[in-house]
């Protein structure tokens, strides 16, 4: 049974989160959690929370056995960007894009 968990508007760019997502795609859930625990990136914390949520959803909603679960799909889409202004010299200003992302994790017992 496939179970989904999402984190929308995560405050990290999709490019940075995809680096972490690629590490756990296709792995068993226990192995994926170990990898994320020892990955020294902010995105790893975000992905780990979503993965733990997907595991809890599978256990609670579908009655799945945690030992059989695998990360079948994980993908990261771009979310909306917040536009900010940084003042520069001689009256100019630069636009700063504070990027967000949508993290989706799908776990399955097959």
Swiss-Prot record:
Disulfide bonds: none annotated. Changing residue 93 to S/T/V: Abolishes translation elongation arrest of SecM. Signal peptide: none annotated. GO terms for biological process: assembly of large subunit precursor of preribosome; cytoplasmic translation; cytosolic ribosome assembly; response to antibiotic; ribosome assembly; translation. InterPro entries: Ribosomal_uL22 (IPR001063), Ribosomal_uL22_bac/chlpt-type (IPR005727), Ribosomal_uL22_bac/org-type (IPR047867), Ribosomal_uL22_CS (IPR018260), Ribosomal_uL22_sf (IPR036394). SUPFAM superfamilies: Ribosomal protein L22. One of its GO terms (molecular function) is structural constituent of ribosome. The keyword Ribosomal protein applies. Coiled coil: none annotated. The keyword RNA-binding applies. L-tryptophan binds at residue 90. One of its GO terms (cellular component) is cytosolic large ribosomal subunit. Pfam families: Ribosomal_L22. Keywords: Antibiotic resistance, Ribonucleoprotein, Ribosomal protein, RNA-binding, rRNA-binding. Part of the 50S ribosomal subunit. In TnaC-stalled ribosomes forms part of the binding pocket for L-Trp with the leader peptide and uL4. The wild-type allele (erythromycin sensitive) is dominant over the resistant allele, and is also dominant over the temperature-sensitive allele at both low and high temperatures. NCBIfam families: rplV_bact. Belongs to the universal ribosomal protein uL22 family. This protein binds specifically to 23S rRNA; its binding is stimulated by other ribosomal proteins, e.g. uL4, bL17, and bL20. It is important during the early stages of 50S assembly. It makes multiple contacts with different domains of the 23S rRNA in the assembled 50S subunit and ribosome. This is Large ribosomal subunit protein uL22.
């Amino acid at each position: 049974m496939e179970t989904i968990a999402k984190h929308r508007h995560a405050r990290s760019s999709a490019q940075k989160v995809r680096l972490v997502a690629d590490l756990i795609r296709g792995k068993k859930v226990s192995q994926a959690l170990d990898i994320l625990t020892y990955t020294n990136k902010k995105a790893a914390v975000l992905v780990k929370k979503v993965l733990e949520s997907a595991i809890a959803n599978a256990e609670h909603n579908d009655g799945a056995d945690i030992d059989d679960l695998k990360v079948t799909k994980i993908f990261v889409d771009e979310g909306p960007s917040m536009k900010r202004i940084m003042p520069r010299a001689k009256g100019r200003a630069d636009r700063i894009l504070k990027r967000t992302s949508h993290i989706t994790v799908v776990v399955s017992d097959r």
